[in-house]
Amino acid sequence: MSIFANKTLMITGGTGSFGNAVLNRFLDTDIREIRIFSRDEKKQDDMRHRLQERSPELASKVRFLIGDVRNAQSVRDAMHGVDYIFHAVHGVADAL
């Protein structure tokens, strides 16, 4: 059992290269839920389809949320119930 057992993880920028790597690292673990938080609905849809083709069971652990890290309220809403966050967004330092 790991520290991530039965926990919820959120990946900001989850459809990018680093976000994909984080998702793949945790997908086949005892984590309860992985939230992908990103602005790009098309990339989320593509990722959802790839996960479904790979394994419907694993795909059921992933929840997709459209949002922008520059919008504090959307981040707060998405974080409700989250135990760990991986921040995989690039290029927002000036916005924060």
Q: Where would I find each of the regions flagged by the language model?
A:
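A short, basic/flexible loop-to-alpha-helix module at the beginning of a structural domain
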Residues: 1-7
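Conserved Rossmann-like nucleotide-binding pocket used by diverse enzymes
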Residues: 10, 35, 65
